Amino acid sequence: MTTVRAATGTVAREAANPAAGWAGQATARSGSSIDWLTGFGLVGVVALLFAVSGGMLWLVGYNYDGLTGNPATKIHPSTYLLVLVFAWRACTFGNPVGYMVAIADRRPASALLAVMSIVLLVVVIARQRPGMAGMIDTFVAPALLVMMLAEGDEKTFARLRTVIHVVMTANALLALFEFATKTLIFPYRLDGEAFMTDLRSTALQGHPLSNATVTSIYVLALLSGSRSLSMPLRLCLIGLQCAALVAFGGRSAMVLTIVLGGCYMLLQGLRGLSTGRVNLLGAALGLILAALVPVAIAVAASYGFFDALLERFVSDSGSANARVEMFELFNHLEWRDVIVGPDIDLIESLRRISGLEQGIENPVIRMVLYQGAFFTLLLFVGFALFMHEVARRCHAGIWLLMLGWLILLNTSESLASKTTLMTKFVVIALVLYRPVVGRPKAQAGHRPQAQPRVSSS
């Protein structure tokens, strides 16, 4: 009788609320691992994301970075593949609507950001504002990927770790090759025009500043995450990536990596001394590096390795002045324009007059100027909740990566324009900071207790 009543109550609730039934069915199935095609599809998405730049796509006739051409080419191929993998997974789940409810229930902030971005995309199109493709690649893609990675098993995450380390190592080696030979293999192009006077390395990530941002984030992840790698291997990768940072010429990324990385290593060293637990091998490696690194830097400097980077610190091509001039644009706008967004032609004219043709180097200021403060506030709330959700799925060392990411965001247009940076960040965070999954208690110690029988009387 009790069993029948419980089943009857469940059916009644599902009949009254179909969404609850879908969510319940999804919860029951969510424990199972994803199928092999979805797993390898996610690996392919990450490989395309990190290894294929706009300059590489131009060689096959895909004008991703340009302003002209087919609108379909303004979305990165990794985003298209991600949507296909998502559709496949929804179909194989058995109930596409139930699948979407399930992953939204597991990652609500990601679902909110995706829905909010799609709604704002419709608003952008209706108001004929720029940034249509930016809404998809910048916000929808990372939210969708986070929701799909919630189902990932250990094998999938192990493959993703391998892809990240291999591609980032290849990216650094290619950057150093370009730096040494003064030849760009896949130069950054805008509508087919390559900026050949800018000899900063582009490697696999495209624009030098995008390269510098991703590399800096990866170095911080090697310091406080990547626990699956041995310490000597991590130190070698950190050295290689720091050398690549010089080739990319990112001043903010270089300074941030040195300051945050140095502070983190100092804190870890002091913590080890305070607890009295000092790893002898780690201490020996630290002493050796402390002796060799200054020598290596001096030798590299004598061969002119840092000349290009130092030149960018001396002459920033008006970058510092642009960060001051961008605030002057608000003096020409009314409050209504600030709230809902001014006329695009007016903003473009003010930019040319103020010498800001190269861009507005702050995402919040740029988004307010082009989309309005109300639009920007909505995205900011969604972004904050999304970052909090990502951080909760990582182990404690994520604070270093999150701090570096939030600082670097404000040194360029970043999220206010079309970019794949946030997708790359969430992949690095979720994959390299994945908590160690322990064995269930039932397997570790004792057998689960048998359920008591329910009397039928």
Can you annotate each of these PLM segments?
Residues 2-95, 121, 405-411, 422:
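N-terminal signal-anchor transmembrane segment
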Residues 58-66, 158, 169-208:
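Membrane-interfacial helix-loop-helix modules of multi-pass inner-membrane proteins that assemble, modify
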Residues 108-118, 127-152:
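Aromatic-anchored transmembrane helix interface
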Residues 161-185, 206-249, 254-267:
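Alpha-helical transmembrane segments of multi-pass inner-membrane proteins
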Residues 220, 399-409, 416-457:
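Transmembrane alpha-helices of multi-pass inner-membrane enzymes
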Residues 242, 250, 354-389:
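A conserved mid-to-late transmembrane alpha helix and its immediate loop/hinge
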Residues 285, 370-410, 433, 441-443:
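Hydrophobic transmembrane alpha-helices and their immediate junctions
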